[in-house]
């Protein structure tokens, strides 16, 4: 086949897409809109932000988390000491949130190990699974079935009921 062919005999097939005609009588309105947005919105916002960042760079303020001292447990409060009971309640709520975070962290570690190990996760993640089961059991022993209106008093009553049930089970086991 020769390098050049006779274009009169074998014309080129027509293109499927029409050739763009860059010559139009009207300018593109999108160009004007983007320039107007840049001038009216983007540049002033950028200038204000850069100014604020420079001011913040001059005056650095360091944020630290708040540390609460431990307060007495609700069992150590006097009967009419409302302030002590309130502090004990707030301490219990902080402990509750900390325990929730501990369970979440251990669960994330277990999930990461299972993801990393794939099919052999039962064998290779046994330590993480054992730790997770211990943490979840301790969490459920303390906080399970408290309901939506949980409090330190309800938790203490639940703990008392659990201790009484354990004593009763121990007596029955000793008698049998």
Swiss-Prot record:
Pfam family, one: NDUFB10
Amino acid composition bias (Basic and acidic residues), ranges on this chain: 1-15
Residues annotated with Phosphoserine modification: 151
UniProtKB keywords: Electron transport, Membrane, Mitochondrion, Mitochondrion inner membrane, Phosphoprotein, Respiratory chain, Transport
InterPro entries registered for this protein in UniProt: NADH_UbQ_OxRdtase_su10 (IPR019377), NDUFB10 (IPR039993)
A GO-annotated cellular component: respiratory chain complex I
Taxonomy, superkingdom: Eukaryota
Region (Disordered): 1-27
Record membrane topology: Peripheral membrane protein
Location in the cell: Mitochondrion inner membrane
Physiological role: Accessory subunit that is involved in the functional assembly of the mitochondrial respiratory chain complex I. Complex I has an NADH dehydrogenase activity with ubiquinone as an immediate electron acceptor and mediates the transfer of electrons from NADH to the respiratory chain.
Assembly notes: Complex I is composed of 45 different subunits. Interacts with CHCHD4.
Similarity comment: Belongs to the complex I NDUFB10 subunit family.
Protein name: NADH dehydrogenase [ubiquinone] 1 beta subcomplex subunit 10
Lineage: Eukaryota, Metazoa, Chordata, Craniata, Vertebrata
């Amino acid at each position: 086949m020769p390098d050049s062919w006779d274009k009169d005999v074998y014309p080129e097939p027509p293109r499927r897409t029409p050739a763009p005609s860059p010559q139009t009588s009207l300018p593109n309105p999108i160009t004007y809109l983007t320039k107007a947005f840049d001038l009216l919105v983007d540049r002033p916002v950028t200038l204000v932000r850069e100014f604020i960042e420079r001011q913040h760079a001059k005056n650095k303020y360091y944020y630290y988390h708040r540390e609460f001292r431990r307060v007495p447990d609700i069992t150590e409060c006097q009967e009419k000491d409302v302030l002590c009971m309130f502090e004990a309640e707030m301490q219990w709520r902080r402990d509750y949130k900390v325990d929730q975070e501990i369970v979440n962290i251990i669960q994330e570690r277990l999930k990461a190990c299972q993801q990393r190990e794939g099919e052999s996760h039962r064998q290779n993640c046994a330590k993480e699974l054992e730790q997770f089961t211990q943490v979840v059991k301790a969490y459920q022993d303390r906080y399970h079935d408290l309901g939506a209106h949980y409090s330190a008093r309800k938790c203490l009553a639940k703990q008392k009921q659990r201790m009484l049930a354990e004593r009763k089970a121990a007596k029955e086991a000793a008698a049998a």
